[in-house]
Design a protein with these regions (language model features):
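Hydrophobic N-terminal alpha-helices or hydrophobic patches in metabolic proteins across all domains
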Residues: 1-182
Length: 182
């Protein structure tokens, strides 16, 4: 995110667009949507690369974590449509529980009222995608203001990063308590 942050901080929207397309594989439509898409990208990448893997590792061990990661890669890069569709369905099932645990963690370390208001009817829904749930919960917990160019926009990325760190600390603390009790 470094080059994007630099371009956004300078107020150089065109450079930010190019960096988002090149480095993050995002296809933004409008200037304000670009920052929201990058925020969503940050939350989703942190979820699928760290939180979901850690969740399955702690719950079922290294094979489950490896299986999740391989399933994620298959759903993103499979060339056969049938294989990709099946991997997406299995990944949705694998993502259901850790995404909700992360959303709950966001509520604990962020704005609890905003998260419960935003996700009250969707938290237990099977139909909502994990990415949508994580992004919505992260933005609500972080109390994201309207996107703006410049330093204020970059600050929202820092706020989301701090939210992710606090959520990781909660997960580690919960795991430590669990280990002590068992």
């Amino acid at each position: 995110l470094g080059p994007f942050r630099d371009a956004w901080r300078r107020g150089d929207g065109q450079a930010a667009y190019h960096v988002a397309e090149r480095d993050l594989a995002l296809q933004p439509e409008e200037g304000t949507q670009l920052l929201q898409q990058v925020q969503g990208h940050l939350l989703w990448q942190a979820y699928q690369s760290f939180f979901a893997v850690i969740f399955w590792y702690l719950l079922l061990g290294p094979l489950a974590a490896l299986a999740y990661r391989l399933l994620a890669l298959t759903s993103e890069h499979a060339e056969q449509a049938a294989l990709r569709e099946r991997a997406v369905q299995l990944r949705h099932a694998f993502d259901w529980l850790p995404a909700r645990v992360l959303a709950s963690s966001f509520a604990l370390v962020g704005n609890f009222v905003a998260v419960t208001r935003a996700l009250l009817h969707e938290l237990l829904s099977w139909d909502i995608a994990a990415a949508q749930l994580v992004i919505k919960a992260g933005r609500a917990a972080g109390e994201m203001p309207a996107p703006v160019m410049g330093e204020e926009g970059v600050d929202t990325l820092d706020q989301l990063w701090q939210l992710l760190i606090r959520a990781a600390v909660v997960w580690y603390a919960a795991y430590a308590v669990w280990v002590l009790l068992i």
